[in-house]
Amino acid sequence: MENKPPVINLPEKETVNTPQKGGKFTINDFEIGRPLGKGKFGSVYLARTKTGHFHVAIKVLFKSQLISGGVEHQLEREIEIQSHLNHPNIIKLYTYFWDAKKIYLVLEYAPGGEMYKQLTVSKRFSEPTAAKYMYEIADALSYCHRKNVIHRDIKPENLLIGSQGELKIGDFGWSVHAPSNKRQTMCGTMDYLPPEMVNGADHSDAVDLWAIGVLCYEFLVGKPPFEHEDQSKTYAAIKAARFTYPDSVKKGARDLIGRLLVVDPKARCTLEQVKEHYWIQGMMEAKIRAEKQQKIEKEASLRNH
């Protein structure tokens, strides 16, 4: 982002850097609606611009909490990365601004809400739904990796659902620009950590491949594959890629998950191979056929009335 302001020691005056439009905003330019979510450092609200009535989500973060939590540089990195990403399966960061006490991120609004809430209600997703989401997240991460961005914290809590039912990656707090492609920082969520992170070894963009393998399992089963009450048992299972499938997980899905949850990062299948996998392609074709049939039946029903 050009002319990117520092996150700390921001001026008292309300101002904004809007590379997309070059305009200036303050919180007074928005009508604030219902809360969409709450985090450790602030909350997210549905809002709309007073001019044009354009719906957005505004993440309101308290500077004092960011500083005391030592995450101001993480936020700066999140803004830098997300402002440069433009993909249908990634939440857009439109702009940001601040006042004396708060920082405001103006984000794309995802009316379908949070993925983990849908998963909690559904218990688990159908194969066609899980396959569709897997295709979308693989496409989004492929785009990120081409830009040397590693997400490092893929999990249902960081995913949202758009107006057409599409998956959207919504949180880039742990992501990094990694042109060198080697990192050693421990980050992310325990159940989704790959063996190389648990072992404290160098890691690359292959961490995201492991994470979507865990995600696919959780989509289909309702819980992650390495979940144990004892943290040491979770880590041991991750290091050995040791897990079992319930009978409900079919052969095709097992094949894909097994190609992603591989201890050796170099041996994991690529994101393009995920998109082209026979289980994903077959499930998506079946979903399209079912939707077409529903449309035909609905039109026939309307004609008969």
From Swiss-Prot:
Keywords: ATP-binding, Cell cycle, Cell division, Chromatin regulator, Chromosome, Chromosome partition, Cytoplasm, Cytoskeleton, Developmental protein, Kinase, Meiosis, Mitosis, Nucleotide-binding, Phosphoprotein, Serine/threonine-protein kinase, Transferase. InterPro entries: Aur-like, Kinase-like_dom_sf, Prot_kinase_dom, Protein_kinase_ATP_BS, Ser/Thr_kinase_AS. The keyword Transferase applies. The active site is at residue 153. ATP binds at residues 36-44, 59. Changing residue 265 to L: In or207; temperature sensitive. At 15 degrees Celsius, there are no observed changed in meiosis or mitosis. Its main location: cytoplasm. Phosphorylated. Increased phosphorylation upon chromatin obstructions at anaphase. GO terms for molecular function: ATP binding; ATPase binding; histone H3 kinase activity; kinesin binding; protein kinase activity; protein serine kinase activity; protein serine/threonine kinase activity. One of its GO terms (cellular component) is chromosome passenger complex. GO terms for biological process: chromosome condensation; chromosome segregation; establishment of protein localization; meiotic spindle midzone assembly; mitotic cell cycle; mitotic cytokinesis; mitotic spindle midzone assembly; mitotic spindle organization. Component of the CPC complex which consists of icp-1; csc-1; bir-1 and air-2. Within the complex, interacts with icp-1; csc-1 and bir-1. Interacts with zen-4. Interacts with tlk-1 and bmk-1. Belongs to the protein kinase superfamily. Ser/Thr protein kinase family. Aurora subfamily. PANTHER family: SERINE/THREONINE-PROTEIN KINASE IAL-RELATED (PTHR24350). This is Aurora/IPL1-related protein kinase 2. The gene is air-2.
